[in-house]
């Protein structure tokens, strides 16, 4: 179920014949039909008519060097997505401000994102970049640690502190609220500290394909 999100990287030596976006959407149509998956996409914010094939996918494209195409594909559920957010902090709020924002967000979400959860955090860039950083963060391997000392320490601290909140599996209490915290970051404006928080439920359905 869920909306299909694709991070598409196209090498600059790759020649594509046809519409790659339509090819991706056709793959979604076939996959959801053949896999008997629930179709979750509606066509309009207010009319809300189901498209009946789970398209269109949300596709983020990046041009890179090389002769390969890489697709990171996720089926992102609505319950956890609804608990996600982007906040523009001030630089003065710093690490403690980020921690407070994340902990408040997870605590207030309770059982709605179907914990135990994976927490993706994007820090920096601007409003939309922080959201994309957070989305990509939830696709990282659970044992993938940041090679930045400050970020690595923050990931571990937040992991421990989230699990001390007592939300627990499905929100009924316990010590396992969070399976992982992953943080991606990017340079930003001197006056800004954008923070995106993307929450993934325990059913983390994603795959990476290289063509």
Where are the model-predicted features located?
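Non-transmembrane, aqueous-exposed alpha-helical and coiled segments at domain scale
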Residues: 1-211
């Amino acid at each position: 179920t869920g909306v299909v999100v694709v991070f598409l990287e196209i090498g600059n030596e790759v020649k594509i014949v046809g519409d790659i976006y339509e090819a991706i959407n056709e793959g979604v149509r076939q996959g959801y039909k053949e896999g008997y998956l629930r179709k979750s996409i509606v066509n309009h914010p207010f009319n809300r008519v189901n498209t009946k094939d789970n398209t269109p996918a949300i596709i983020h494209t990046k041009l890179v060097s090389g002769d390969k195409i890489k697709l990171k594909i996720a089926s992102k559920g609505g319950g956890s997505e609804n608990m996600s957010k982007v906040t523009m902090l001030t630089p003065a709020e710093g690490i403690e401000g980020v921690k407070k924002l994340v902990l408040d967000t997870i605590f207030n979400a309770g059982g709605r994102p179907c914990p135990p959860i994976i927490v993706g955090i994007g820090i920096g860039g601007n409003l939309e970049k922080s959201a994309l950083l957070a989305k990509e963060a939830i696709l990282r391997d659970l044992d993938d640690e940041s090679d930045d000392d400050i970020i690595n320490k923050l990931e571990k601290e937040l992991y421990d502190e989230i699990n001390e909140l007592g939300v627990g599996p499905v929100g009924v209490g316990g010590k396992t609220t969070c399976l992982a915290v992953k943080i991606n970051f990017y340079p930003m404006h001197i006056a800004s500290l954008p923070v995106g928080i993307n929450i993934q439920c325990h059913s983390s359905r994603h795959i990476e394909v290289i063509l």
